[in-house]
UniProtKB/Swiss-Prot annotation:
Protein name: Zinc finger and SCAN domain-containing protein 12
Native species: Gorilla gorilla gorilla (Western lowland gorilla)
SMART domains: SCAN, ZnF_C2H2
Statement: the UniProt record of this protein carries the keyword Zinc: yes
Keywords associated with the record: DNA-binding, Isopeptide bond, Metal-binding, Nucleus, Repeat, Transcription, Transcription regulation, Ubl conjugation, Zinc, Zinc-finger
Matching PANTHER family: ZINC FINGER AND SCAN DOMAIN-CONTAINING, ZINC FINGER AND SCAN DOMAIN-CONTAINING PROTEIN 23
Record-annotated SCAN box domain positions: 46-128
Gene Ontology terms for molecular function: DNA-binding transcription factor activity, RNA polymerase II-specific; RNA polymerase II cis-regulatory region sequence-specific DNA binding; zinc ion binding
Family named by the database record: Belongs to the krueppel C2H2-type zinc-finger protein family.
Residues joined by cross-link Glycyl lysine isopeptide (Lys-Gly) (interchain with G-Cter in SUMO2): 20, 25, 196
Length: 604
């Protein structure tokens, strides 16, 4: 059972604040100083300060006294300067205003200042903006396309908000702090806290026994192990897999690449540790401590000769240089795709298994990568921070904005390998490729065209003449429900799609999109025969009939054929219904907006 922390502050402020776990007290000054100087202990005091309740005290004087003591132990004015105290307050507020999913990601990096938070978020944004890939995943007879994304949080991982942080010792690699990337993404969660408490209830907290136990447990938990206390030094690592694979010298953790051994040792501490005087973090080697201390000093001695970007560690610089050299030493055995980082390969390989560990709490939708869940959450929050400077449209992801901007520039980066046709959007390419996948297509027996299953059902109504969706006002019928919905706006006068440039409104979104190209000058539909470009697909189809000679519209009276349907004038509507003039008038009025209908009916 997890222990309950209780704080007792004495009226005499000269006496030290006592922290106890259930009935046990840290009575010696040495134990108290050790806890007081710990970074995680400061976080405990901060939480108690923020969550302090007036009802827990006997009166206002005691409440004020306890608040002063808690704040004193949190901010440490005897060791911190005014600037450092201000930075702590700003950092706390900065973390508080972040969205919950970002709070969890940032807290995992344990930032010490607001600048570190900015660095973490900027690095995360760069990783999320990397172009994705399509990975074919076979499950039974189905084939689905997944998007490669950078993971954010594992399923079941607790939300590391400001109110739920645990006071736990942790060994970290400065390289991983700089890179915001963990080779072995494991955590010291509730199992560690509960196990530590079970042992602490059976042991007297004296000497170095507690310290050694914490080091052993930190080492074990870092490698993803959950052991019983008596098995800590006897059982092999829970994460070892194959005898032939390289393993960690400290705890036998299995590694998939020889190069991972160095990576793993940076997060798996040895017996000796080196502590940072500024923040209390501990490291297994002195060189790691030196590199970490550059976070506090701001020193970045390793500079890239190509782009001038500077780094705190040599290893981080070496990894960065891969961007310029294009070297990708880590290759996927399934599809052959190569990566510059082992962690990127590890994330990519999850796509082939089809596993979806990350679930949305709002709708239950599952994702194989944390980044997929991260982007999906924006659907519920309606967050669209990325805006196009050309047309002012907003998007939830920078990558979608980049794709959209191809509409204005004319860039079509997604090309079909089968026929060479190019598209602005990757989704358009995926839809197009279904034409070539015969096993996924449904072919019309009348004309031979291929469609998806739902598309074929709608298409066949063209041949059968079936129009199941009928307008209640004018009794006009349609093949699709969406066509009926758009048509009914003629009678209601509703024009929900308005142009931001000139204020003109339209009944259909597609008509607005085509209209906006008048302002932007965009003509994305190009004729392959003569090179003429058009704003809309309908205009291109009509134009292409000049080259093909197709004339699909025929006159019922004389049999003459035409390339495009002639628009019916109001006069022709009345002439066609000359035998029933009132029916012609009603049909004509039904095509007008309600305001005009009422005006004309008064004159009739």
């Amino acid at each position: 059972m997890a222990s309950t922390w209780a704080i007792q502050a004495h009226m005499d402020q000269n006496e030290p604040l006592e922290v106890k776990i259930e009935e046990e007290k840290y009575t010696t000054r040495q134990d108290w100083d050790l806890r007081k100087n710990n970074t995680h202990s400061r976080e405990v005091f901060r939480q108690y300060f923020r969550q302090f309740c007036y009802q827990e005290t006997s009166g206002p004087r005691e409440a004020l006294s306890r608040l002063r003591e808690l704040c004193h132990q949190w901010l440490r004015p005897e060791t911190h300067t005014k600037e450092q105290i201000l930075e702590l307050l700003v950092l706390e507020q900065f973390l508080t205003i972040l969205p919950e999913e970002l709070q969890a990601w940032v807290q995992e990096q344990h930032p010490e200042s607001g600048e570190e938070v900015v660095t973490v978020l900027e690095d995360l944004e760069r990783e999320l903006d990397e172009p994705g890939e399509q990975v074919s995943v076979h499950t039974g007879e189905q084939e689905m396309f997944l998007q490669e994304m950078v993971p954010l949080r594992k399923e079941g991982e607790p939300s590391m908000s400001l109110q739920s942080m645990k006071a736990q010792p942790k060994y970290e690699s400065p390289e991983l702090e700089s890179q915001q990337e963990q080779v072995l993404d494991v955590e010291t969660g509730n199992e560690y806290g509960n196990l530590k408490q079970e042992v602490s209830e059976e042991m007297e907290p004296h000497g170095n026994t507690s310290s050694k136990f914490e080091n052993d447990m930190s080492k074990s938990a870092r490698c993803g192990e959950t052991r019983e206390p008596e098995e800590i030094t006897e059982e092999p690592s829970a994460c070892s897999r194959e005898d032939k694979q390289p393993t960690c010298d400290e705890n036998g953790v299995s590694l998939t690449e020889n190069s991972d051994h160095t990576e793993h040792q940076r997060i798996c501490p040895g017996e000796e540790s080196y502590g940072c005087d500024d923040c209390g973090k501990a490291f297994s080697q002195h060189s790691y401590l030196i590199e970490h201390q550059r976070i506090h000093t701001g020193d970045r001695p390793y500079k890239c000769e190509e782009c001038g970007k500077a780094f705190r560690g040599r290893t981080v610089l070496i990894r960065h240089k891969i961007i310029h050299t294009g070297e990708k030493p880590y290759k996927c055995n399934e599809c052959g795709k190569a990566f510059g980082r082992w962690s990127a390969l590890n994330q990519h390989q999850r796509l082939h298994t089809g596993e979806k560990h990350y679930h949305c709490n709002d709708c239950g939708k599952a994702f194989s990568q944390k980044a997929g869940l991260f982007h999906h959450i924006k659907i519920h929050t309606r967050d669209k921070p990325y805006q196009c400077t050309q047309c002012n449209k907003s998007f939830s992801r920078r990558s979608i904005l980049t794709q959209h901007q191809g509409v204005h520039t004319g860039a079509k980066p997604y090309e079909c390998n089968e026929c060479g046709k190019a598209f602005v959007y990757n989704s358009s390419l995926v839809s197009h490729q279904e034409i070539h996948h015969k096993e996924k297509c449904y072919q019309c027996k009348e004309c031979g065209k291929s469609f998806s299953q739902s598309g074929l059902i709608q298409h066949q109504r063209i041949h059968t003449g079936e129009k199941p969706y009928k307008c209640d006002v004018c009794e006009k019928a349609f093949i699709q429900r969406t066509s009926l919905t758009e048509h009914q706006r003629i009678h209601t006068g509703e024009r929900p799609y308005k142009c931001d440039k000139c204020g003109k409104a339209f009944t259909q979104r597609s008509v607005l999109t085509e209209h906006q190209r008048i302002h932007t000058g965009e003509r994305p539909y190009k004729c392959d025969e003569c090179g003429n470009a058009f704003r809309g697909i309908t205009s291109l189809i009509q134009h292409q009939r000049i080259h093909t000679g197709e004339k699909p519209y025929q006159c019922d009276e004389c049999g003459k054929a035409f390339r495009q349907r002639k628009k019916t004038s109001y006069k022709e509507i009345l002439l066609k219904n000359h035998s029933e003039p009132q029916a012609g008038v009603n049909l004509l009025l039904s095509s007008l907006i309600p305001e005009w209908q009422s005006c004309f009916r008064k004159d009739l």
